[in-house]
Amino acid sequence: MKVVIIGGVAGGATAAARIRRLDEQAEIVVFERSGFISYANCGLPYYIGGAIEDENDLTLQTPESFWRRFRVKMNVHHEATAIHPDSKTVTVKNLENGKILTESYDKLVLSPGAKPIKPGFDGIDSDKIFTLRTVEDTLRLKKYTDEHHPKSAVVVGGGFIGIEVAENLRELGIDVTLVEAADQLMAPFDRDMASFIHAEIRKNSIHLMLDTKVEGFADTDCGIDVKLKSAPTLHTDMVVMAIGVAPETTLAKDTGIELGIKGSIVVNDKMETSIPIKPPPTTTADFG
């Protein structure tokens, strides 16, 4: 049996390891668009602030170590661009040299993950605006702070990532403003619990702006302006957007796989998508 997995970060790498434990003979091939596999996003902000000092500590495995341990072929910088259920093949682009290849499969696992939400605000594509989802995002943000030595930063979004980014930028001595559209940080928390978070944020000299919505951005000669709906414009050296993520399901949608109302992939109790698995012509399947 040959299994192709699209996505090699947390879910994809875990699936590959589990499949290997269940089947020692299976051929397992993973395609990952980024240059890194098997990492947890939770630790990324702490590389920015220096709590994690070594870049290599951000990842649990490399393609080489994964092959040695599990005999799974990890292809980084490879993006799956099309799925062909009728022929049971996947079209893949090598992002390093632009070559296109076709990979066959018996079973296909989708683990595309999520992407940061970036609203269509004016100025959203500024090179002074960052997101933090991948190792590449982290290295880009770290490079910017190391080379440009920003004195101020605005973090938009008061969830886990936003708070952790604000904490770690503050550790660098940066003057940080945390902007949240709701009337509290950490929406899943009760208001009385969130109040403790608010107090801790302020205790660490982070400016907290609640009930404040961002409307757009504008580059300036010496930084970037953050336009707010109900408050004066903030001038800062850099911005980190951390207002949540959305399912990365463009490939699934293009394939005709059913999606839910929020864009995630619909599956049954066996984690199968709306496109059934077709048995090879030489076998007999029992659907009873």
Task: Tell me what each language-model feature is.
Residues 1, 26, 107, 127, ...:
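Nucleotide donor/acceptor-binding cores
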Residues 69-84, 204-214:
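A conserved beta-strand/loop element that lines the FAD pocket in flavoprotein oxidoreductases
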Residues 110-172, 207, 267-269:
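Glycine-rich dinucleotide-binding loop and its adjacent helix/turn
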